[in-house]
């Protein structure tokens, strides 16, 4: 959200990544409705990291399918062992078709803050307004301190 953007910029970042947030927009027509609803209903604790043992970690929605991937990794599975269940095809089965039993969906840590499916324009308008309010607040604090 706008607060996260403002905080990142204040810490010196050039920008932020908003992949999960953009999935939950009206313009994201390729994401299955089940995927979007899972994003809306998820809490911060509803994601896990898969493919860590392969040196290519990625955060996904927690499900029986993704928990199975982690168990196989813990048991020492190689890339070849996991290839069919970590492939782009497995990802597509969920994000396009809504097949949670045979696929997975990427999801960022911000997932618990997503609670609507706006248009991209609405999303940006809200973020910009939040950033502007935050900047005004900071300006007021600085102004007050310089007059002490």
Identify the residue ranges that each predicted region occupies.
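Conserved active-site-proximal phosphate/metal-binding subdomains
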Residues: 2-148
């Amino acid at each position: 959200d706008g607060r996260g953007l403002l905080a990142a910029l204040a810490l010196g970042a050039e920008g932020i990544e908003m992949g999960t947030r953009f999935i939950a927009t009206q313009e994201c027509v390729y994401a299955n409705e089940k995927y979007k609803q899972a994003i809306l209903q998820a809490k911060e604790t509803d994601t896990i990291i898969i493919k860590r043992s392969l040196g290519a970690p990625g955060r996904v929605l927690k499900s029986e399918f993704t928990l199975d991937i982690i168990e196989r990794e813990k048991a020492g599975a190689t890339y070849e062992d996991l290839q069919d269940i970590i492939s782009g095809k497995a990802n597509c089965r969920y994000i396009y078709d809504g097949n949670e039993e045979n696929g997975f969906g990427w999801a960022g840590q911000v997932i618990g803050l997503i609670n609507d499916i706006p248009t991209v324009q609405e999303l940006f308008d809200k973020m910009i307004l939040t950033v502007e309010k935050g900047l005004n607040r900071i300006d007021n604090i600085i102004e007050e301190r310089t007059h002490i």
